[in-house]
């Protein structure tokens, strides 16, 4: 019974609301002037994709190959990452050392599905297939973003930080001003 009352009241409310909106007198005039009309809302268009062609896969592969190459010093790799500074060179060297020590080198790369980025239309996204020498982790796929820089391409800072943990890992090399570690006590003998 209660359900029927609710349905009836709900229907009556809807009918009343619709009926009242149609009951205004056609000759009724407002005493105040009509509200000024606002200009139509327009959304600002997204930045259009560049007119230049997308980079060739080889251009992106070259960036990644040089980053993973142990023969290229970290100071020469800084220019391969968006916003990297000379202070990041040591982290880049540690990354390459970790790849070598972990038996991941040599590495090869394949850049697929290259497209303009949805977030920054002047950047490109690519699905990169990384093939390593490591027997247990031979191949993996990772989406990477690249930034146009001085006629070439750089790995985006965000992608570099995810891959290299650059800027998030403390410097593991002792500084010149660090005191030498204390000798461990010798067991009584």
Curated annotation (Swiss-Prot):
Major place of residence: membrane
GO cellular component, one term: plasma membrane
Biased composition (Low complexity): 169-179
Subcellular location: Cell membrane
Region (Disordered) residue spans: 26-49, 166-189
Membrane topology note: Lipid-anchor
Residues covalently joined to lipid (S-diacylglycerol cysteine): 23
Range of residues in the leader sequence: 1-22
Keyword field: Cell membrane, Lipoprotein, Membrane, Palmitate, Signal
Compositional bias annotation for Pro residues: 180-189
Lipid modification (N-palmitoyl cysteine), residues: 23
PROSITE patterns on file: PROKAR_LIPOPROTEIN
Family listed: Belongs to the MTB12 family.
Protein name (Swiss-Prot/TrEMBL): Putative lipoprotein LppK
Encoding gene, per UniProt annotation: lppK
């Amino acid at each position: 019974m209660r359900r029927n009352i609710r349905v009836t009241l709900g229907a009556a409310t809807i009918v009343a609301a619709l009926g009242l909106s149609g009951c205004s007198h056609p000759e009724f005039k407002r005493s105040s002037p009509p509200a000024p009309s606002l200009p139509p809302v327009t959304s600002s268009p997204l930045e259009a994709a560049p007119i230049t062609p997308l980079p060739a896969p080889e251009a992106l592969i070259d960036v990644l190959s040089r980053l993973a190459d142990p023969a290229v010093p970290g100071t020469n790799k800084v220019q391969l990452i968006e916003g990297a500074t000379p202070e990041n060179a040591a982290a880049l060297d540690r990354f390459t050392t970790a790849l070598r020590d972990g038996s991941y080198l040599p590495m090869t790369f394949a850049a697929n599905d290259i497209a303009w980025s949805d977030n920054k239309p002047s950047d490109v996204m690519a699905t990169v297939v990384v093939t390593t020498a490591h027997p247990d982790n031979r191949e993996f796929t990772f989406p990477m973003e690249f930034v146009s820089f001085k006629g070439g391409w750089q790995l985006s800072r965000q992608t570099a930080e995810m891959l290299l943990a650059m800027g998030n890992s403390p410097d593991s090399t002792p500084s010149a001003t660090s005191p030498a570690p204390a000798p461990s006590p010798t067991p009584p003998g």
